[in-house]
Regions:
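Short alpha-helical elements
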Residues: 1-253
Length: 253
């Protein structure tokens, strides 16, 4: 029996239990499997280094892969976003999004979609996210860091618009200027509003700080301190799980 800070409480697990087949008898409870995944994400340890009081690492990793490819993690993300919005009397589906990106170094593991971000001087991948005005993670796309924000901005905004069709406006920084504004308007029937820096020095910019705070939340998990994954899809699942834990902590304080 383990008792780590990353473990879900009974209330937290019960809120997402319906997404799993818990009726079939198993050697290891699915809640314990989930706890093992969260431990890896929080501590940044290798799967093979998972403490022995969890299920065998092979079992934990197997279920992580299954839930990733089955889309269960993504569905749970939508559920917790809905519940947080409902808890503050917001409509279930947002009308406003905020887009931003974060470049992360990759490791010797290598993998797909790795490039060089000349602006940040980072070799690795870029995490592109869209949040709502509460900072809830709506969508994430991980791709090579070599792509400029405006080059991949349409893709991630399109993902958000496809999942949350009520989105009418998206806020972004100056990296998303140019033809992207017209592209978003014409193809997605959505307004892209650019918030630019107007002076030097530190200044909290409207809306921008919200998405930057979310990126900060995600960075609290050591697995996100760099991109350790071979596949961008795995990186996306790790980020989704990181926010799910943040959301569950908010919902069940």
């Amino acid at each position: 029996m383990h008792n780590y800070l990353t473990d879900l409480t009974d209330n937290q697990w019960q809120s997402i239990e319906k997404f799993f087949d818990c009726k079939r008898k198993r050697k290891y409870e699915l809640s314990a499997i989930w706890d093992g995944i969260l431990y890896v994400i929080k501590t940044g340890c290798q799967w093979r280094m998972l403490p022995k009081d969890f299920a065998p690492w092979q079992t934990v990793y197997y279920y992580f892969r299954q839930w990733k490819y089955a889309g269960i993690i993504e569905v749970i993300l939508e559920e917790v976003v809905y519940k947080i919005r409902e808890s503050v009397n917001k409509s279930p589906s947002p009308t406003v999004g905020i887009v931003d990106s974060q470049s992360a170094k990759t490791t010797a593991v290598g993998g797909f979609s790795i490039g060089y971000d000349a602006g940040k001087k980072v070799k690795g991948r870029k995490r592109h996210i869209v949040t709502d005005t509460l900072g809830n993670l709506l969508v994430v796309e991980v791709h090579s860091a070599s792509y400029a924000d405006r080059a991949k901005g349409f893709d991630v905004i399109s993902l958000a618009k496809d999942k949350y069709k009520t989105i009418e406006k998206v806020f972004a920084d100056g990296g998303y200027t140019g033809s992207l504004i017209d592209q978003v308007k014409q193809k997605l029937n959505c307004k892209l509003e650019i918030i630019k820096r107007t002076d030097k020095g530190f200044k909290v910019l409207p809306k921008r700080w919200i998405v930057e705070r979310t990126l900060g939340w995600l960075s609290n998990d050591r697995r996100n301190s760099r991109d350790y994954e071979f596949s961008p899809l795995t990186s996306e699942a790790i980020i989704q799980l990181s926010f799910i834990k943040v959301a569950l902590n908010k919902l069940f304080k």
